[in-house]
């Protein structure tokens, strides 16, 4: 394995899906099977299972259940872990919080759980899909058990990128810890709205992919899920076993820019290596 890649061969790859979407529905109505037409969750489980991930899902949790689950996910047999993936499916909340049955849980608190010394060097990928709005787009829903109203209306509009600035600051503050007294400061352009100064140690090894959509609680097709999750899973299968996850994310941004330019996810990377999910003998990227 090249020194340019994290050592993941023979180690356990983990995915945690935090699905709080039903909590944002009117009167919290959900389908009779409790899944609330969530193609995203189905697609994520199927995709990551094919990539030999150990998949865990938590739905509609309280704050204490959410935090306890995440802690156990992080700390169990940590020496065997190759990488952590966390997908948050979360609607109807403020930009920097996760809706729970008893209030909200901040994303900063979630990220801070991964600052333990024992997991700092392990690559961590967070995929945050969040929507905020009164309308529910069920135009593609084909689940007979769904009790949600369908509204076919204008295309949803994404929130202005400046909403993310304070969120990113809090995220980086939570994840930033001095490592041997040394930190690196960089400036990253957050769209064309503002410049955020990011201070983070070399050892955090974190990727955050964040997309927020306003106007709709948007789930999309029950088989495909929302656009970002669908494209992420498709490209992860296509590129994740042949090159790096970084390439996968770039391809998602590329496709979103072409097909849905208002909803290109914001990506924050703080990595010293590339994350590769396939057999080391199949790496086709150029060695440095």
Curated annotation (Swiss-Prot):
The EC number(s) this enzyme carries: 3.4.22.-
InterPro entries according to UniProt: Caspase-like_dom_sf, Pept_C14_caspase, Pept_C14_p20, Pept_C14A
SUPFAM superfamilies: Caspase-like
BP-aspect Gene Ontology terms: proteolysis
SMART domains (UniProt xref): CASc
Gene3D superfamilies assigned to the protein according to its UniProt record, in alphabetical order: 3.40.50.1460
Domain of life of the source: Viruses
Expression induction or repression: Synthesized 9 hours after infection of cells ex vivo.
Any one GO MF annotation of this record: cysteine-type endopeptidase activity
Keywords, alphabetical: Apoptosis, Hydrolase, Protease, Thiol protease
Active site location: 131
Function of the protein: May induce host cell apoptosis and contribute of the establishment of a special cell cleavage process in which apoppotic bodies are rescued by the virus and differentiate to form large vesicles in which virion assembles.
Family to which the UniProt record says this protein belongs: Belongs to the peptidase C14A family.
Name of the protein described by the UniProt record: Executioner caspase
Species this chain originates from: Spodoptera frugiperda ascovirus 1a
